[in-house]
Amino acid sequence: MAEVLKVLDGPQWRTYARVHERRAGRFADPFVRRREQGQAHPVEDFLFTYYTLKPGQFKRWHPGAGVILLDTAERVSWKFYRAATEDELVLAGLSPDDAHTHAECGDAVLVDVPQFVDKRGTALTFTREILGNTADKKAFFGCFGMHEWAMAYKSVQNNIRHDYLDLRLGAEGTDRVVESHRIRCSHFDAFRFFMPQAAPMNELQPTRETQRTMEQPACLHANMDIYKWAYKLIPLIDSALVMDCFELAWDARELDMRAAPYDLLDWGYEPIKVETPEGKAKYVQHQRELSERSVALRRRLLTTINTFL
C-alpha cells in the first residue's frame, strides 16, 4: 500500500479540482458542443472517440494514491475510494482531536489502493510490461507516418470515402506514395486499419499478441496510447499526470494528421509533405520532440506503478 503523503483540506483540493476542470475543459468542452450540434472535427475528436474515457470522467479531478481529501464525504461512494482511518489521519499530520473528528464524520477519503490492486492488478501488470518494453526499445524514426497513407491506399478500389476530407494528392498520387516508400509500422492498432493491398507491404506484421513486445518510443500511436494506459489506472494515477499524457497525445494526433494524405488546410492545418525530403525532415524533427516527452511520461508512470507492484 502506498504511504499517505499529505492531506488536502476542502479549499485546497477544490482549487486543484477547478484548475484541472479548466485544463481538461479546454479540450473536452468544444468536443461536447460539436457533438450536441451534430458536428465533427477530423483531428480533435479522435481522442474522445477512439479512446474510451468520457468527457465528464476526463474533467473529474483525482489526487492519486497517498493523498487524503478532507470535507468530501461524497467520494466515499466513488469507485476505488474509501474513508480514511483515524490512525491514517494522525500519520498524515492531523492532531489526534482533528483526526478523531474527521474519522467520526467520515468526510476524509483517499484512494483504496489495496482494492484497486486486487481488482485491477492484471491491468497494472500489463501496463508496466508494455511501458517498460517500449522504454527499453531503440526509437525508430524512419516510418515517416506512412501508416496513415497505407490506410488510404487503393481508396477507389476499396470504395473508401471521407465525407469532408479530400486526399491532398488524389487517389492515384496517394497510391504512388505508398508504393514508393518503405513501410515499417510496429503498432498493431494502426496496422489493423491498413487497406488489404497495403498490409503485405508492411515489413512488420504486428498482432494483438505481440503488441507488448513490438511498441517503440518513436511511434506516434504508441505515444498517444500512454494516455490510455494512464487513464485506465484512474484514480490510482493523479489527474495532472493523466493530463500531461493527454496533451502529448493531442500534439501527436496533430502531427499524425498533418503528415497524413488528407487536405486539412480548410481546418487550419498546414500539411507536412512527407513525400518530399523536406517534409520527411520536418516530420522527424517533430517526432523526436514528441518521443523525448514520451520518455519522461513513461518513466513517471512506471515509477508510480512500481510503487504498488
Regions found by a protein language model. Give the residues of each.
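A contiguous catalytic/ligand-binding core that recognizes phosphate-bearing ligands
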Residues: C105-T210
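Residue-level signal for alpha-helical context at structural boundaries
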Residues: D166, D244, D263, I305-F308
